Amino acid sequence: MAQDEKKLIIGSRESLLAVRQSELVLDYLRKYFPHMQIELVTMKTTGDKILHKRLDEIGGKGLFVKELDQALRDGRTDLSVHSLKDLPAEIPEDLLVIGFSGREDPRDVLVLPEGIADISEMDFSKPIGTSSRRRTLQAQELFPQASFESVRGNVLTRLRKLDEGQYSAIILAAAGLRRLGLENRISRFFSTEEMIPSAGQGILALQGRKGVDYSCLDGFVSARSAIAAAAERGFVSALGGGCTSPISAHAEFDGADETGVSGASGASCGFGGDGLAAGRGAGAFNSMTLSGFYFDEETCRIYRKKITAKVSTPEEGRAAGRELAALIMADMKTHR
């Protein structure tokens, strides 16, 4: 059998959004490797099963990836597609991140109930629903007159709860709504200065096993996203945060992206070579502006900082993330 006729099993969470995101990879492979056999396997994760608590109240790491990681280890799947913001800071030693997709719109958005056309019509007797303290803390500054409550479930479930009248509005990621074709539900975009997005928001992470050749994905992965991921996650890691912590970072670039999504590299998945490390093919960018948000639990104080750095590799991006974290830690010392 030719190399591009090998079978590739993609693992995904079973929500509609997760499946749509996995289908972006599936569609790419089918377009450029039409003889490859591809199967999509879905499963519930721990984070999908516990819906009565906020994510930061559940505790633990990898709430949305543990089951997918085990499927990779067991050989039941060959590739996992994750929302990068759900991926723990520490990657298991026996697995690797192959690369990152081009970034969808990273901003958070306000969604009003159906029939409500303008923010001026919001009923502030009802809470605004959010799924994270990061969003709540930043939204409190924008809507000081509002109360806030947790809203869990997939995107469609949250929209249903909103339209049933449980909330005056909810805050979601623009990327999820766009990937589901629900842009019409967006009532207001928050700029990345008003509400700094979760680290990795809008980026997909492709995870696989060591010892497997994933070079067929060379044309899908983005060098810019690899650097952004390293910078944003480097900031979070340096401050000891995880995917449920009230901490966030966002990188913006001058210069062109190096994503190869428009065309395949001509390689194929051999399933026998060495695994490929994240961040391959990084391009040259003029500069990166990295913004960070951190909530200090000890003093209940919010910190925001930003830096600009010249970066061309994930390692340089990660160093910028650590530099930004160091600035916030120095500022924190003066208030404790």
Model-derived features: positions:
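Small-molecule-sensing regulatory modules
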Residues: 2-44, 49-50, 57, 141-336
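Short, well-ordered beta-strand segments
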Residues: 9-11, 80, 98, 129, ...
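Short, structured active-site "lid" loops
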Residues: 53-78
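Short acidic active-site motifs
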Residues: 67-68, 118, 157-158
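Paired acidic/hydrophobic, glycine-rich loop segments that form the ligand-binding mouth/hinge
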Residues: 73, 78-83, 168-173
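Ordered, amphipathic secondary-structure segments that act as subunit-interaction surfaces
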Residues: 75, 82-85, 207-214
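A conserved helix-loop-strand patch within extracytoplasmic ligand-binding domains
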Residues: 84-85, 93-145
